[in-house]
């Protein structure tokens, strides 16, 4: 009776078909031995099944059992822990009984560590992640909408937002509909849909439950993917990538000082080297003789043009960053850092490749990037912007420096994340915008 069906379903050894009989009615049980909880089924559900309720199991066990006739999604459901009970080759019930093999909740590894805030981090189970958000936000206005991607694996996504602010959900779902990947296992696949051709990141990735909760209360939407321990937040702006989750709870003088420094670090990381190159190459008359003599002394022994010196240092820094990020253990990272310390420093200066002042300024610019943000996409964007400013400054002097700065600010001012300005929200007065940034308050919806 079920031979043809078994031949279609049993494509792998872990898929187990079992024929059995209930009051002379032939039935078939199908489950995955690694994912479906057959022990739970045998101990609790199977003893309660008899001829009187065999065709009403979805009413006997509501929420656990569903009735279906479409065999198209059987393979996907088996991989998610469903157990199938066929009463005929055309009719079946599926029991949602996955084996619980989730890892324990741990601290987020991609967000800055803060001992004064919640240490909860997302895991690879969507239901657990939603429960963690609900633990932080018991507000009835928090709205959760589930969505299934239109791909082969039918990956499950949850959109979490605040009622009255979930007007982005339709646009988000239209973006998700365009995903063509057979199996979406990383949140980066979803981020790519929102990125498009933008030069700056259009989503904020975080695995901190508190970060997501605060963002939702500020009117943003969190996108969670089943199987991923990372959430994406939209819409975003430039300064969202530099904020800490405890900024809203710190004294005004502390938040003002820290955000002033963060803003200064952004300016230094992008513009300091370009300004120095323009000044030295074209406008030495603006410097005193004492300053010029000191600069010449620091560059004594170097044979390469300033542009090449800076390029070599930046390439070495990027080399160590990528080498460290691709290493699998702290032991290897320590070796890379040790070797980097040997290569960059006194040995590089003695070799005549670079000067000490250029090395110092380039190091300050590069480190300032990490003081502003830990978002890898934005770090790369800042690095490319720095090279853009240096190139214009090297060939056109201060005119090139000003042109590059104007072009960068023009691009940021014209960029939007959904309907929100990326750099500056024109609907809010400059005075209020500055006040909101430097003195953040919990519940502020405009950041």
Question: Where are the model-predicted features located?
Answer:
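Broad structural signal for hydrophobic residues in well-ordered alpha-helices, predominantly aliphatic
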Residues: 5, 172, 319-320, 392
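Glycine-centered flexibility sites
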Residues: 81, 117, 121, 219, ...
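Transmembrane alpha-helical segments that form the functional core of multipass membrane systems
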Residues: 237-373, 377-387
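Hydrophobic alpha-helical transmembrane segments of membrane transport and translocation systems
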Residues: 354-358, 362-447
């Amino acid at each position: 009776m079920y031979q043809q069906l078994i031949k279609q379903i049993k494509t792998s050894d872990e898929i187990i078909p079992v024929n059995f009989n209930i009051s002379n009615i032939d039935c078939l049980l199908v489950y995955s031995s690694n994912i479906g909880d057959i022990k739970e089924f045998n101990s609790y559900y199977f003893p309660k099944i008899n001829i009187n309720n065999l065709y009403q199991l979805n009413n006997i066990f509501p929420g656990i059992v569903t009735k279906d006739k479409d065999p198209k999604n059987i393979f996907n459901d088996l991989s998610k822990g469903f157990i199938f009970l066929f009463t005929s080759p055309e009719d079946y019930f599926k029991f949602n009984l996955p084996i619980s093999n989730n890892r324990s909740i741990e601290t987020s590894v991609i967000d800055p560590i803060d001992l004064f805030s919640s240490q909860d981090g997302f895991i690879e189970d969507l239901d657990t992640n939603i429960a963690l958000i609900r633990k932080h936000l018991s507000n009835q206005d928090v709205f959760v909408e589930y969505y299934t991607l239109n791909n082969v694996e039918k990956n499950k996504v949850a959109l979490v937002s605040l009622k009255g602010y979930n007007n982005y959900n339709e646009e988000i779902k239209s973006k998700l509909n365009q995903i063509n990947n057979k199996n979406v296992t990383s949140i980066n696949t979803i981020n790519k849909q929102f990125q498009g051709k933008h030069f700056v990141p259009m989503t904020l990735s975080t695995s901190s439950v508190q970060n997501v909760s605060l963002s939702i209360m500020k009117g943003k939407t969190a996108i969670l993917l089943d199987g991923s321990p990372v959430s994406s937040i939209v819409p975003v702006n430039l300064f969202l990538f530099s904020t800490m989750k405890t900024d809203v709870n710190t004294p005004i003088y502390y938040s003002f000082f820290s955000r002033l420094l963060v803003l200064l670090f952004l300016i230094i990381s992008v513009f300091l080297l370009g300004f120095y190159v323009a000044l030295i190459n074209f406008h030495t008359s603006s410097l005193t003789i004492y300053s010029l003599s000191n600069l010449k002394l620091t560059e004594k022994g170097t044979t390469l043009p300033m542009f090449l010196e800076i390029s070599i240092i930046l390439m070495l820094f990027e080399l160590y960053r990528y080498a460290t990020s691709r290493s699998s253990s702290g032991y290897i990272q320590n070796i890379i850092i040790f070797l980097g310390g040997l290569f960059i420093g006194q040995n590089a200066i003695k070799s005549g490749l670079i000067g000490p002042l250029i090395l110092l300024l380039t190091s300050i610019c590069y480190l300032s990037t990490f003081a502003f943000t830990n978002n890898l996409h934005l770090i790369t964007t800042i690095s490319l912007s720095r090279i853009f400013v240096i190139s214009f400054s090297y060939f056109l002097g201060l005119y090139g420096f000003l042109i590059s700065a104007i072009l960068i600010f023009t691009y940021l001012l014209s960029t939007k994340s959904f309907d929100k300005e990326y750099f500056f929200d024109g609907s809010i007065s400059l005075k209020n915008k500055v006040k909101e940034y430097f003195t953040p308050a919990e519940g502020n919806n405009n950041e």
